[in-house]
Amino acid sequence: PASADTLGATVIAPVVEESAKAAAVLLIFLFRRREFSGVVDGVVVAGFTATGFAFTENILYLGNAFGEDQLSGSSGFASVTAGTFFVRIVMSPFAHPLFTVLTGLGFGFAAVSARSHRARRIALPLLGLLLAMGLHALWNGSSSFGPYGFYAVYGIVMVPAFGLVTWLAIWSRQRELRALAAELPVYAAAGWLTPAEPSALSSMRARGMARDLARHWQPDR
């Protein structure tokens, strides 16, 4: 029945799928704690986790759509495969990463919270997970809001949310680099770093150049 399909898409799927993806983020947060130190780490870990999930799910959906087209004899732009490809690959390739990044942000903010704020460190990931489930449910249920519900949710909610998360990740990265630029010269003055290292480590461009140089450099023989 249509009501059962709607319930599955808007309640069961968001809860199960976001919980599964959050479990992967939680494992890294717990067992690779030194590498999970802030908001950017939360965005990256959650984004990669959800991208792998979306890749697998898209293959399943496209495979099922292709099977339907084989049975019905449909082909071209009117086929189920073409429609599925347009909605999942063209219109919403970042849907799953966007949902789970909200969970990752919760873990990221928890990572920078003081250890004495135990309640906050628990509540923030849970809040992120609830937001991820809510956005996922809204997205899955958008088609039930009328003929233009999908496009309304896409333009009013999904696009601004994606832009906000992108801005937050860039801002957080720049903040970390400014902190390095301010603090590392003290270590250089103490002799723990060379004079050039603080500038190199506080610039993404300089880091990239250093990696390229190390990749192509060969010692004299």
Where are these regions (language model features)?
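Hydrophobic alpha-helical segments at protein termini of multi-pass membrane proteins
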Residues: 1-221
